[in-house]
């Protein structure tokens, strides 16, 4: 009998600590040792955790102390009961984290002063237990609410309780921004008003009991989506959630014994996405929709199980409802709003419902988010000699810890590394503050500097169950090869609360005797004059010099939650390629990049919830928010794409896709406060289809949509294949007839496939490509501009730029154009990211029997030495991987529009661009040129030769001459051509790069 009682007690304990979608246990049962943190203990503060002593003033003093001394950091709260009687203010970047066998609990005492009456001048008409603010609130000051610049604030592993006599009490006010969250918090509201007012950024594993509302909220700050994973609502008197423009996406929500789950405020809209969730005993409508059939209303449910929910939705304006007769049923899908079944469908307002009756409610999913490993298994990184002082090289200590142990706790500190940290299959790196805890590179760290392929600071295992939590990744400003994290772990892996440092979101770290720099916002404006001009400020010369911040590749996947990747120094914030492993993104903010925020290439089986992009005025005027190539089976939910109020130029599109199928956009929001919202929400480049609505509840890219212009084989007909380019040039073909070209300033390399008749983005490396070519083995050769990395020394000296003797003779060599050099790298077009290799420079003449030499298509020689320099033999050439293709190294490579192939024994044509003529030369076995003769008095940038030896010249239009120089005709093209190449399966199709068109 004693044994049976024990079993019953254990079961009761489990019932008390596990409620459907959430668990109520302490996730930090042991004290995390962190020398940078503060601990709210009787040893440090005059308190008792007995639930009787009022600790309000001591708690506020402790929080303010962390802010004053550290500016960002953690106040650890040990297990116990803490009585408070007034509002506690938590300023930017301060986190309250509980620990102990049981979660600590803060209790608002009965009849606490000020909580009995509605606060008329308060936004939420209430008084709060904990209010997250933008700064420390001094005595007598009005609090400045948390907002768009309130980062890194949090409360975790703490319970809150409102005792009787506080009818206008709300436990939390959380209008904060990135890397701020509430997690593992249960709120016992009782007779109080609500658990939380004004959602922000992200919530995880939260439970609300009682109250008028669990959550009531306005628009998040500053209008971003909000992710809530694993949540429980029970016993609210009015609604589980009351909302207006909240942008909530929710996975694994359980609502029970409530009059309504979602009550949207009158005359407001919302974007609500709900998946894998449960409603039980909802006496009124599950969702109250007040502005039905408005494009701003986007209500989407997937796999929602209901018991005793007779009314799924009520539409107040029309006084209609969606009733369900079944006692227990599954909402397979519910879509309300503006919808398109495919990209060429007519947008229509619809309410689509797919419901099936079921016999019983399924067992609710306990938790959607992977659990951290047991805390007893953690080892502290500091015990391995890591200093975290920002100066000591901690690489060896960190790697030794990884090699010996799986679960590594990383206390706050800035850990300098000089080599890639490589995770084992079960490595889990756990921090608790992504700005206070950073892995950092010094400027020009040798292993990450100069030219080379992408090199990660942190590299996961391939196919492992890795975790990276609560740690910032700082690649510095100038480290050309740097990637923040390369992620190849499996579908069960987990990345959470990771900040890619750089650009916005930086905080001052106090230093003894050093004053914090003052902001520039309130300086008086200067007035420009010819004698004292005022230049626009804010441009950082280091922007866009590194690879991607977060790179998921080689079948990497898993869960990525609460990620902020806004380093303007990176090519883009998030790049996923070559993976079919399931991946889930929960709340990812990607912002402030120069060319591209997000890129997906050859990705399938991913779900993306609450992705938010933002383009800033100085850095992001030309930035493409999302780029997708060759992807399928990808779902976006609550996708927000935003341009800031300071942007003053239009941009083409927000999502640019090529060769994609079954891409679902559920709740799409393309917006800005300015008139320069991106013109098109979604654009299919190959099919020339644009989606004009900026607000959509549902859009499906099927991949079966027809081309808007059919591609025919009619001889002489010009087909536009793609647009939305800037300055397309550098055209080349491989042995199969596929065509490649580049966009120099935007640093993009494109491929046209002759098999699929479609364009794709092949590469967007930080290097600046100008011309492309192929060797005999189909290695893609990329001629690119290379600027020496500032601060990077080799053997104590800066990188040397070779002095080219042919700089004389062209005025282009002035004005800074001799401060860089041209180099060539090769890649395998099937795997460009992993195969980057710099071509060696070897003496001309080293290769006796050249397969082909590659020369500039055009030269600008305005000092009239074109004839001499064209047959001049430079000292060095670049040697391709095949060992027999060369590129003689001329200064003119820095300005040429393409590389033309010179085959020994065949005539070679090139353009004297300044004198506007084509010349003809002979090609020797060693690839050198001789016997220059004038061919035709026409020429500009590119040219091409067909199988019959006819010459095609780009010069405003395309002019055709036979091999004797006789004019045969002209091809009119819709835009000024730059470079030409024959390709296609038969090699008989002329491909043309214009400026913005292909």
Locate the predicted segments by residue.
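Extracellular "leader-to-stem" segments immediately downstream of a signal peptide or signal-anchor
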Residues: 2-76, 84, 89-164, 168-171, ...
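Active-site-proximal segments of catalytic enzyme domains
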Residues: 561-573, 577, 583
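Long, distal/terminal scaffolding or interaction modules
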Residues: 580, 604-609, 613-619, 623-637, ...
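Ankyrin-repeat and related helical/solenoid repeat scaffolds used for protein-protein interactions
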Residues: 251-253, 264-292, 297-301, 635-638, ...
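C-terminal, well-structured subdomains that either form a transmembrane helix-short loop-helix hairpin
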Residues: 409, 576-578, 584-599, 654
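Active-site proximal loops enriched in glycine and acidic residues that flank catalytic Cys/His/Asp
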Residues: 245, 266, 412, 578, ...
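Sequence-structural signature of mature extracellular/luminal beta-sheet repeat domains
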Residues: 707-998
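Conserved metal-binding segment of the jelly-roll/cupin
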Residues: 74-81, 85-87, 93-97, 407-420, ...
């Amino acid at each position: 009998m004693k044994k049976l009682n024990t079993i019953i007690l254990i079961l009761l304990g489990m019932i008390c600590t596990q409620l459907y979608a959430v668990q109520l246990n302490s996730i930090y049962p042991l004290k995390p040792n962190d020398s940078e943190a503060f601990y709210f203990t009787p040893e440090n503060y005059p308190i008792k955790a007995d639930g009787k002593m009022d600790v309000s003033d001591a708690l506020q003093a402790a929080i303010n102390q962390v802010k004053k001394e550290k500016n960002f950091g953690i106040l650890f709260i040990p297990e116990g009961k803490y009585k408070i009687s007034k509002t506690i203010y938590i300023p930017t970047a301060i986190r309250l984290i509980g620990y102990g066998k049981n979660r600590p609990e803060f209790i608002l005492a009965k009849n606490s002063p000020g909580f009995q009456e509605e606060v008329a001048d308060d936004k939420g008409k209430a008084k709060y237990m904990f209010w997250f603010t933008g700064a420390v609130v001094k005595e007598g000051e009005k609090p400045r609410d948390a907002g768009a610049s309130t980062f890194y604030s949090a409360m975790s592993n703490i319970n809150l309780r409102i005792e009787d006599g506080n009818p206008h009490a709300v436990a939390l006010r959380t209008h904060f921004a990135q890397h701020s969250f509430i997690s593992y918090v249960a709120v016992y509201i009782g007779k109080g008003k609500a658990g939380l007012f004004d959602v922000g950024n992200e919530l995880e594993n939260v439970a609300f009991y009682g109250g008028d509302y669990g959550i009531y909220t306005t628009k998040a700050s500053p209008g971003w989506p909000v992710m809530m994973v694993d949540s429980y609502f029970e016993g609210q008197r009015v609604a589980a959630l009351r909302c207006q423009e909240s942008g909530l996406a929710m996975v694994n929500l359980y609502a029970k014994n409530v009059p309504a789950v979602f009550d949207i405020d009158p005359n407001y809209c919302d974007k609500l996405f709900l998946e894998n969730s449960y409603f039980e005993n909802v006496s009124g409508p599950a969702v109250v929709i007040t502005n039905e059939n408005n494009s701003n209303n986007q209500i989407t449910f997937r796999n929602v199980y209901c018991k005793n929910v007779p009314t799924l939705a009520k539409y107040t304006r029309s006084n209609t409802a969606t009733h369900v007769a079944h006692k227990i049923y599954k909402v397979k899908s519910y879509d309300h709003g503006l919808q398109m079944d495919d990209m060429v469908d007519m947008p229509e307002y619809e309410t689509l419902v797919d419901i099936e009756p079921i016999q019983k409610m399924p067992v609710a999913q306990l938790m959607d988010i992977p659990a951290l490993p047991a805390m007893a298994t953690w080892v502290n990184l500091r015990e391995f000699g890591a200093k975290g002082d920002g100066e000591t090289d901690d690489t060896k200590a960190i790697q030794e810890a990884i090699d010996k142990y799986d679960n590594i706790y990383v206390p706050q500190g800035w850990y300098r590394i000089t080599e890639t940290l490589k995770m084992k299959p079960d490595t889990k790196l756990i921090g608790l503050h992504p700005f206070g805890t950073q892995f950092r590179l010094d400027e020009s760290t040798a292993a990450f500097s100069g030219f080379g392929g992408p090199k990660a600071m942190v590299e996961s295992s391939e196919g492992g169950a890795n975790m990276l939590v609560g740690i910032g990744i700082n690649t510095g400003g100038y480290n050309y090869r740097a990637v923040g994290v390369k992620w190849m772990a499996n579908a069960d892996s987990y990345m959470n609360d990771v900040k890619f440092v750089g650009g916005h979101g930086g905080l001052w770290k106090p230093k003894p005797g050093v004053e914090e720099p003052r902001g520039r916002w309130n300086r008086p404006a200067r007035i420009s004059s010819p004698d004292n001009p005022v230049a626009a400020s804010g441009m950082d010369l280091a922007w866009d010099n590194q690879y991607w911040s977060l790179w998921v590749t080689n079948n990497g996947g898993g869960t990525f939650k609460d990620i902020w990747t806004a380093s303007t120094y990176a090519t883009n914030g998030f790049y996923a390629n070559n993976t079919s492993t399931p991946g889930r993104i929960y709340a990812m903010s990607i912002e402030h990049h120069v060319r591209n925020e997000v890129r997906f290439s050859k990705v399938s089986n991913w779900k993306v919830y609450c992705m938010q992009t933002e383009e800033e005025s100085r850095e992001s005027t030309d930035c493409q928010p999302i780029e997708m190539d060759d992807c399928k089976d990808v779902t976006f939910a609550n996708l927000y794409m935003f341009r800031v109020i300071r942007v003053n130029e239009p941009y083409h599109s927000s999502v640019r896709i090529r060769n994609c199928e079954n891409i679902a956009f559920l709740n799409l929001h393309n917006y800005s406060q300015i008139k320069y919202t991106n013109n098109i929400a979604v654009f299919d480049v190959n099919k020339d289809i644009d989606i004009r609505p900026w607000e959509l509840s549902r859009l499906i890219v099927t991949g079966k949509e027809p081309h808007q212009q059919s591609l025919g084989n009619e001889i002489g007909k010009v087909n536009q294949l793609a647009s939305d380019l800037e300055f397309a040039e550098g055209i080349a073909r491989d042995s199969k007839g596929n065509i490649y070209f580049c966009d120099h300033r935007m640093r993009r390399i494109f491929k046209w496939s002759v098999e699929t008749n479609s364009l794709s983005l092949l590469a967007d490396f930080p290097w600046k490509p100008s011309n492309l070519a192929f060797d005999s083995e189909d290695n893609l050769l990329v001629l690119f501009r290379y600027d020496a990395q500032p601060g990077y020394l080799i053997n104590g000296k800066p990188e040397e730029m070779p002095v080219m003797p042919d700089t004389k003779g062209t005025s282009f060599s002035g004005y800074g154009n001799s401060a860089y050099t041209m180099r060539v790298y090769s890649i395998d077009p099937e795997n460009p990211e992993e195969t980057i290799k710099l071509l060696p420079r070897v003496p001309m003449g080293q290769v006796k029997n050249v397969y082909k030499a590659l020369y500039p298509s055009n030269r600008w020689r305005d000092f009239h030495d074109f004839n001499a320099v064209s047959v001049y033999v430079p000292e060095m050439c670049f040697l391709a991987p095949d060992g027999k293709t060369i590129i003689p190294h001329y200064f003119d490579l820095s300005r040429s529009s393409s590389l033309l192939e010179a085959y020994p024994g065949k005539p070679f044509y090139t353009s004297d661009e300044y004198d506007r003529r084509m010349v003809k030369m002979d090609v020797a076995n060693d690839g050198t040129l001789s016997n220059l003769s004038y061919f035709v008095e026409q020429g500009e940038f590119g040219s091409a030769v067909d199988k019959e030896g006819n010459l095609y010249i780009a010069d405003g239009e395309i002019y055709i001459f036979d091999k004797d120089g006789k004019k045969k005709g002209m091809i009119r093209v819709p835009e000024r051509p730059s470079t030409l190449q024959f390709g296609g399966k038969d090699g008989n199709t002329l491909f043309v790069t214009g400026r913005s068109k292909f």
